């Protein structure tokens, strides 16, 4: 797909629309104990000239044991107290990635120039 870039991202990283994700903490192979859930994200950015849609789907061995959801942005008006320490991802109010939502039959919007992610 022309104008589409993506990268695997840790489930611990927040994918903000205006900042390329670092990819820190990504493992080549995921492991878990029996009964544990493991997750990762697929961060993507569409650089096309207009909004498009994609219809992601899982394939391969074990696909019936996995699911894919989109990470939606939610408003955050007061991200931190003015007298807080420096260990925050951002100090600005805005739209933050937080809500996991099932993908409808309409697919996922590709918004030009913004990083977004899928949660697997």
Q: What role is predicted for each listed range?
A:
Residues 2-24, 48-119:
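Surface-exposed binding patches on compact interaction domains or structured appendages
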Residues 25-52:
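Contiguous beta-strand segments within globular domains
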